Amino acid sequence: MKTVRGFASATVGNVACGFDVLGFAITEPGDEVILTLHEERKSECPVSITAISGDGGALPLDPKKNTSSFVVLKFLEYIRTSKGIDFKGHIDLELKKNLPLSSGMGSSAASAAAALAAANELLGQPCSKMELVHFAVEGERVACGSAHADNAAPAILGNFVLIRSYAPLDLITIPSPEHLFCTLVHPHTELKTSFARSVLPRSIPLKTATQQWGNVGALIAGLLKSDYDLIGRALVDVVAEPKRAPLIPGFLDVKHAAIDCGALGCSIAGSGPSVFAFSSSKETAERVGQAMREAFLLPETNLKSDMWVSPICKEGAKVL
């Protein structure tokens, strides 16, 4: 019997102007998955979920419906058909959720990435990290009905990841400037990803599209040049944020508080309700976080929140 513990951290998808094509990982918080290998098959399905903690009973125990176990099943199928590894044993899976559900923090992607890191290690690392991304993306389809990669890819690979194409999946990792820090604030409210996507327009004017393209190009350039001023100027979302901002109580107050306190920029994390900000020092990022939390507590909103300050995670999913 062999046991492996996998860990993957929170991620932020979209990054303001990079709707569905850009995301990054932070160092904490994150989900942990513990896999135990048994020599003999216990059931027809080679993976069983033995325990889930931290989800309040919300996540399914059916291995074909839970993101963390589903991606392990896809991984086992792939190594059988593509690597010639016919797994005859059984895997028990324990999931420790440290990320809130429906938070905009890449909760499902973290579970999938942690499970894949552990499974790959458990079976002798037959797959590269880039191969693992494909399974994590399929896990997103189970979680929310859409196989998007802006959380799944950085959860596996770390750093910033640009999705150039989905068919075929073409990913570009982008290093983070040394002193770039993320403040992530999660208000104690829930916003379903499916609903947040439903408010978005099916088409946008060409003028709006060119604004968004200019901003995402500038953001990539700012990251590569370590140009913090350019990063701040580029963190403008003219597509999703205007539609989603009304869904997050107090968002505009929180954003203004972050900017007034010295943040380079501030926007919605993924589909929300979490909000992120970038700063060029840890000290500024911590001050920004306190200001954002205080803004959520204003009388018209009065929402408690959790806060994390982190550099960009450079290694992605890992084995503990």
From Swiss-Prot:
Gene3D superfamilies: 3.30.230.10, GHMP kinase, C-terminal domain. Belongs to the GHMP kinase family. Homoserine kinase subfamily. The gene is thrB. Its main location: cytoplasm. GO terms for biological process: threonine biosynthetic process. Its EC number is 2.7.1.39. GO terms for molecular function: ATP binding; homoserine kinase activity. It is an enzyme of class 2 (transferase). It catalyses: L-homoserine + ATP = O-phospho-L-homoserine + ADP + H(+). Keywords: Amino-acid biosynthesis, ATP-binding, Cytoplasm, Kinase, Nucleotide-binding, Threonine biosynthesis, Transferase. This is Homoserine kinase. HAMAP family: Homoser_kinase. Pathway: Amino-acid biosynthesis; L-threonine biosynthesis; L-threonine from L-aspartate: step 4/5. It comes from Chlorobium phaeobacteroides (strain DSM 266 / SMG 266 / 2430). Disulfide bonds: none annotated. InterPro entries: GHMP_kinase_C_dom, GHMP_kinase_C_sf, GHMP_kinase_N_dom, GHMP_knse_ATP-bd_CS, Homoserine_kinase, Ribosomal_Su5_D2-typ_SF, Ribsml_uS5_D2-typ_fold_subgr.
